[in-house]
């Protein structure tokens, strides 16, 4: 008992340390009571126990330890000094409490840790807990994980840093202990609540089963953003206030913290900085000084590649910067200057603040270089100086900038002012104090009086920006002497400025923005209560706790429920079934057979391994049918796939069986519950077949189906490992291709990138180029999701390979990853809340750095190295430092354990040798990058000493120290630096340099923090002393930092801290505080973003990578918003109404709800006029530039803001081109409905469109041009006239695009220029186009010259400005141009003038060189056109038009406009070839506008035709040379009543008058030649082909027999016919409209034409035959393949039946059929086989086998067999399913023939016989055997080989080839030398040219591949005049139809025949097999023509009767028609 009495007397603190456990127990109990009684947290009583708390928790006695833990918990909760014990106590808890068996001890230990977090020691707690994860005891690990999980759940990810936790997670999942793995799973679920993407990406490599389980749990989690349930002490007071205000219904301004966005892992943070200095070429510094610019360029290009890395490692860049600076400043080559500027930009962007030390050296040089005026240089310099500014402060470079302001060069002054303006935009009122503003204002005020307007404008902009930033109060003192006009200009500029930190500033705005917060908080609280309970359990304690409520601490805290448990229970019902993984054991083969036999037919299983492939194929078909019928639940997937794998399995040799197998695998995966076990069975076989040519696609489909069933990440990993375990390069490349597509379809978010990287690297090293290419393609796809950081992983690859990778990445630049369309990604994105996190799968790429292994370097930090670093000799110290740098460089990424290195490096920071200090600092920067976030554990022992170096007297040392501190802070964040007294101790030192740099650093860092440790208050007294420092710079820096300290600490705390100051000082400081309070920025940097995200205000580009159609996107946005508001912010709605319509810059989407519902263009009264006045008065920039600069774009934005809907403006000025397309689509939609708005904003719209002309994206440009065409059409309809301002700011930029290389763009631009003449006088257009002829672009010059010719042709010489003489002299200069197209265009334009004015042109063009004059004279001689004064005559006839052309105000309208437009189009097309300039007469033009305006009455031009010079019919007509066609201008406005006009024109095609027919064909051809107009012909194709075919018959029967008729005219008619048809058959959509009957007649006519001997006798006959040949090929290729094949079969049948038919005819039909057979493999899927087989059946019925054998030639039967064989080969047994249209299959020979053929083809491939058949066919005319042919050809080649007979041999070979065109001479050439082959080919070409040159028609008669020719010569066929060639009896109906046509031609009435039933009714009856001839289709079409003709005549007569004097009367009209009838009768009789 004596012992007991001794310790009982001891004081409490000694009892706690006593060796007896009872004494300690008593001590702990007493201590607990004492702790609970102390009310003051700062009581000195707490300090007594400061060193004992660790012992409380680490007591060896378990019972005593429990009491100690209770006491420790109360101590930590209530003691102010408790934070100092954090490290040792938490370490003790981890090691001595968490391993205890008692649950109570563990719970108390966890509570202690959480309490330390609450008192703001979270990072220390986290650090100790993370150390505990390395403990070997699983219990400790589990407890540490649980503590971290609870801390995260309660305090949130803002307090508990996720980055270090996420990195250790994978290791926990690998633990052997199940409890550790289970707790890790719960932890991963909790982390996922706070940061989804980061944890997903990190855990991709864990066991797939674990990953699957996790994913199932993740899906259950609520989608809403989580909120902390417990708060730090510093936040609790704020929370209490917020709750009170919310309950009182008041506004809570301070409640923004709740809504803070959860901090995401920043991609830039995860990037490893790239060290580029060592990678510079060794000879870089020599090359950069080289005399040759090419060498200097090489050096700069090498640097440019290196600085493209997004993050650069800090280092000594001084030499590099110096070299680049020298190039910028002194190099004479502007291209190199721009390149060097780009390099500087890259350095500044990559180094960020680390580049700041070099900014002062570079800025003056860049500013001086602005004297260079080249746009590309100026732009590069602007980008460089803007990037550099962001690395430094305006204060640092102010002296340099101000020095340049006095430069005499206006460009330098302008650019400097603009730079200042841009810099001011980044400033705030605190960073732009008066002391800094004053010198800038003084300099800028000089500039506003400068003589150069651009300098004045720039100065106004800079002053306006300053005014916007700091307010009028600060700037007005400097503007006292400025006059009112200039002051107004400054204010105007100020209003337009948009600041980087927000458009509006000041407290009012902040208050407005913060008002919705309480409502939103309340709403989300109400809506989210359930979720909160689920996740956090019953823990309201911390929410209501105030600092005063301390009693009973532990009990009040409550117990937190594990989120894994309760959250799971709360969200179980929400789980989606589609994400559940199917798990099944592997079954034995016996079980599989048993299960399969239950669901498959018995024969199916028996025949699986049959030796007969047909049986196996039949078995597969049954298998497939069975699988298709199975239900998901009853499908035994594993059993089925094992059956498929049964021998022969995946080694199946027959490709058809194999294809079926693979297809069945895909079906099973899609339809059944397909598990990974099943997948493992088949994947190996699929990978083996993926490279197979025939089965590869099926294998890919199966793999995709498996990926959907088993998830892509797992499938891809398996497939890749299997593919690269093989050696087959084809399989590898195809696997990579499949993966590329799969990633696009499934998304990227869950892929195990690490596994792929190794395989991709293997692929890149492959010898096979296909594998490498596929790997690079895959990398390109991955780049879409991962971003530029992906490249780092491949930096070690060979340069050539790296350049290919870079090129692939470049292609992907700017593209968005496509939205996933398959797999779970699709469901999860749709299920995600709209505002939740619009991130794309690409976010997964943020953790790419984590893919790289970190290396342990502690073993390399030896004691020898440490002693070297500390050696007395500085050289040895340097060696040691060099070694350390080398070690870190080599490792790149290192682990945090670096041994004794920190101590050694710390010593070197105080080194007397400053070079070594700098080197040490560089090493520390390297260390930060290499170690990453783990560097934070070295902040106290290494980071703080670096801050001491900031006090060094040398600038460069301080700069290096600052760069090091920044590098560390980037990795660690700021909390480590601000915690404790270290920073305040540094600030306390009275070193001006140290204070200056440190305060500047704090001013930079503090604004970015959302919260700071309370220890920041310790710095305040020293901050106040700095405010009074003797050094002005220190005082300034202190003033700059003051608002940011106040931002975090609040005004009250700051004011309270002045209590210890002297009264005088206190007053000064309080005044400064008041001033700082006004400028204090809002504390949280991102609450606005946090609000905008959940409320749907984020950019649509993020959430919708693939833009939806505009209508959908707009409407869906409008509809979706109200739902969003209901769900998320019901409390805000009332306020939204109150602020509706006001321009509040709120980040919520409330303002956007109404935006899209209103008009897109707002009519502002006199808005356009005001803008014109502003531009005229030089208040704004004149729209005149070479390339658009930022200031122009900003100006346009500002101007648009008042009259363009905000949402549309955002789309218009978005950086992504897809948004521009969207904007244009919306503008097109609103064009008609908002005419007034469009016209009022026209100047702005046109300016915006000029910006799009400078885009490189073709789709935007095409869309813009399409919009312009519609716009100018609308303007002309509205009779609008372009103003001078609109024209001058648009036309020059439009003319730039006329030189585009793409034809379609040039064509559109020309069309727009044409339409512009309707809204702007042509005479004013002329100078703009003339200016375009001065371009360096030859295409632009040529097009502009051609356009000038069109204008002159249309408007006469009056259009030439300033005078015709000057204009023509300018045009004539281009005759001597180097470019051929320009010369031709200039010559043609002059010839156009010559055609109008004759020889007068020679006076106007002045003196030309002899060469140019001779070219012009030659061209004029060659011109086929006689001088004509057409425009002059028109001017006489229409004086109004002349007036309008010369008038500025009045423009041509309606009728005259049409006429002018038509003429302009004609002139445009004819100007290139004046010899074809005979005008198409008015009678044959399609005047659709007039038709449309005639109120539905069809008005054809027939009466005019009758009235006009009828005697011309008997005179020779000058036929237009078939060159380039005139373009009809009226098809744009084509509507329903154009059909009658087209019918009328088509009827004229069949006219007996050649001239009429040619004119009609020309009209149709001009339509067919224009893609946008050709659709008008749709529905008229059969009608047109019938009319054309009739014209061919007419030529054959009448014209060719007429000896009086000039055969050249027939050739021209043929040219037009064939040209028309070739144009038609090049348009696939129209060609496919031709029906079978019409095609049959057409082919009949064309083949007969080729056999017409009379054609061959004509001079151009051969050319005609070649043209027909080409046309036949086009018809065969482009027509509907079913129709043409059917037509040919019927034609062959008819030709064989007809006794009069020539054998040659049948042979040509068969040749056509053989060509169709060759096309079948490509067209088989588009053919209706049932119809074709019906035609063959009918053919075989008409020609049975015996009858065919009786034919003279064997080729019909061989043709039929070849066709059937090919069909069998392509379709296989399925062909027998296509006999559905044959009524009696049993009677048909066809079925039996097909069965025989199928049986035969099973045993033989049949390919040999096919080839022999085709060869036989190609020798159809050869009577000799193959051997004889070979002998004959051998003889010819022998002659060619001899010197004497070479020419004779070539001639014979040419004749032979011509006669037997299908003969293959390749075998004879194959064995000869290359020289001999080319000699033979050249010789044949020469002979061909010689023979053709004698009688060649002018170039217009040939058909160029581009189809530039209008009409092509075409011989007709030998068709009988009766219209039928097959010898069949022709019925009377055909004669009647022909009679109707003749009557119509003569204007006679056809009404008497109306009661006759139409012939087409015969077609409805199932007549005999042959296809109905086209003649049968004439009746309905011609009836329509007749009716329209009669309507036209009647309406004309009616209208004529009511006409005034000067028009025809009814009687005269009738007389003329009668006269016409008589004349036509006379013509008809004379022709007979």
UniProtKB/Swiss-Prot annotation:
Positions of modified residues (N6-acetyllysine): 48
Region (TOG 1): 1-223
Gene3D superfamilies: Leucine-rich Repeat Variant (1.25.10.10)
Locations listed in the record: Cytoplasm, Cytoskeleton, Microtubule organizing center, Centrosome; Cytoplasm, Cytoskeleton, Spindle pole; Cytoplasm, Cytoskeleton, Spindle; Chromosome, Centromere, Kinetochore
GO cellular component: centrosome; cytoplasm; dendrite; kinetochore; neuronal ribonucleoprotein granule; perikaryon; postsynapse; protein-containing complex
Record-linked SUPFAM superfamilies: ARM repeat
Bias (Basic and acidic residues): 1808-1822, 1984-1997, 2018-2032
Domain-level remarks: The TOG (tumor overexpressed gene) domains are arranged in a N-terminal pentameric array with each domain composed of six (for the most part non-canonical) HEAT repeats forming a oblong paddle-like structure. Intra-HEAT loops are positioned along a face of the TOG domain and bind to a single alpha/beta-tubulin heterodimer. The TOG domains in the array seem to be structurally and functionally polarized. Differential functions may range from microtubule (MT) lattice binding and/or free tubulin heterodimer binding to potentiating stable incorporation of tubulin into the MT lattice.
Stated name of the protein: Cytoskeleton-associated protein 5
Annotated source species: Mus musculus
